[in-house]
Amino acid sequence: TGVKWDTAERTQKLLGMMSEANRKKVREAQKAGRRMVGGVYKRTRLDEEGNKVQRAEVRFDDIAGCLRTPSGGSSRQSILVVEGRKIRSRLLSPREAARLMGLPDSYRLPPNYNDAYHIAGDGVAVPVVRHLAEHIFEPLLQHAQRTEAAA
């Protein structure tokens, strides 16, 4: 699957970048009694003194954050897997990013992580475009064509 788990030290560093509110989400996931999988993004936030600091923000609601093109470490989404006291982290794989964007597994991705991730980042999900086309754009176009023909 092309996934490589982070070291325990790297996972601890990621957890250390979290605000108290996000660390609370992790503690709640630990108490859930089942495996919890969350998406983690690094964001620049202001601290109490107004200084910009990099923060890790986690969500466990089965919603993936916006996939951004990789220009630096902050644009790469990580996965956090919590099973009781055991917490592991890793980058979202390029194949997982492609799946989130609606690309089939048969779609050939470049071997380089950034090149492959770039295909999915800052894109529009194929299923979303298909839905918009079928339910909004095409009906509007057909209506406009009928209106124009009747005029």
Range-by-range predicted roles:
Residues 1-151:
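S-adenosyl-L-methionine-dependent DNA methyltransferase catalytic core
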